[in-house]
Amino acid sequence: MEAKQYEEQVDATPLPRKSAEYEALVRAGPNLRALQQIQAHLLVSGCHRSRALITKLLVLSCAAGSINYTRRIFHHVLHPDSFLFNSLIKSSSKFGFSLDALLFYRHMLTSKLAPSSYTFTSVIKACADLSALKIGRVVHSHVLVNGYGSNSFVQAAMVTFYAKSGALDVARKVFDEMPERNVVAWNSMISGYEQNGLGDEAVALFRKMLKLGVRPDSTTFVTVLSACSQLGLLDLGYWVHDYIINHGIHVNVILATALINMFSRCGNVSRARAVFDSLDEGNVIAWTAMINGYGMHGYGVQAMEIFHRMKAYRLAPNNVTFVAVLSACAHAGLINEGRQAFASMRQKYGLVPGVEHHVCMVDMFGRAGLLSEAYQFIKELGPQELVPAVWTAMLGACKMHKNFELGVEIAERLISLEPENPGHYVLLSNMYALAGKMDRVESVRNVMIQRGLRKRVGYSTIDVNNNPYLFSMGDKSHPETNEIYRYLDELIWRCKEAGYVPIPESAMHELEEEEREFALRYHSEKLAVAFGLMKTTHGMTLRIVKNLKICEDCHSAFKFISIVTNREIIIRDKLRFHHFKEGSCSCLDYW
């Protein structure tokens, strides 16, 4: 049949939904070959004139992942109606063809068909998935012009869109103007805060939600647990877990994985394991989360045990799984296991190692003092694989094992690759200082000043009475600053009495030695632990989250603090966990 004849015959001719042809489409589902065969049958039988059948065919072709086939079918539809457009826009947006959803929406407008709330929710979702802020604002104006500005579903979609696009102020304004906010709207706003790194705002809104009597669902909890992970709010994480249990909320794999991640990242890996063991049937993501949880705490043997069990259950590890495995091997010094895992990626699973895997391997060799092997590994990488992150891992190994000559060479290479990254200058300055080349330290510092580069600010958060408190180095913003500083001074004196000796090299090298010790004393994690000791009862474990790697001096000081206060102190820095107890650290000084 010619295309023109086909166009002429695809009209609004109705067909009963329970026809044999419709049932055939339902049975075929999103199977492209089957759909093409059914389309041929429709053409021969004349049933292609049914708008219901054509709409169903379009929806299923989207679900099958063939947007080109969808476009070809749509091209032959004469005078598509609103129902067809809405179904097509929703399916395109739902199955990842967001740009096509916007193009179909434009076609709908040029066809002089009025969009509905059903249209707008799908179009706004497409804008959110594309982070298309400008287009989304235009669609928002269409919403208002068409009188759907107060529709709760459209408003919830707008909240999600603005939040995903980073326009949190606008998202909150839309949210606050909603006459009725259902759980979907609350979830959208809470998720927006969490995904934009504002975990404290997410938690505050969650508490407001509870206060107003809105019952959270599993989606709410997944987001809140992620915020707890971000902030290290273990007590709130306990509360959420208890709420889930007490209210009989079904713990699916997604929620269980969120719990595993939260407990692991907040320092209670045994509780994470309990959640993992309670799963009837986990997926690769849940298994990977448990491997990662053990790895970040330095429990490499346990991480590998989970990895081997996963393979025994015939669950194929993916690239993310191998990042977790290799990281666990690096932090625990499991060199042979790491080598075997890396080799198996290509040989057994057909996976191509990426940047993260290469960084883990260099880090693993470097931590173990195998600098020549790490350097040889780098030399064997292709030009496109020699990214700054790989060299940064090598530089960290040079600093750890005091190979100043190679460290300076690599730091200078990093600066040539990323001249606007202040971290590289700081590392180069440290290498020069450790090598005793103070004139070079001053030179690097001057270059940073000339280029307007500033060292990344370090901060630490501590959860006290279910509230997060943030500190930065030398922070004096807290209302109890004087008491905190007095307590910390006394604490450091007690540590010195027990044998603690400050390590001035950990401070800024442009300072005099006495000034360096003063700067070290008021690092953010020391202020956080002083506040925590002041505000909690004797024997309570303190948990601190730091955005940067803990320095050598603070690592040493916390061992002594754990002795003189008889407390366990858990610190999560940007690399791993450190459990300080009775004068030792779980990392065994291997970080």
Residue ranges and their predicted role:
Residues 188:
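Short glycine- and Lys/Arg-enriched binding-loop motifs that mark or flank ligand-binding interfaces
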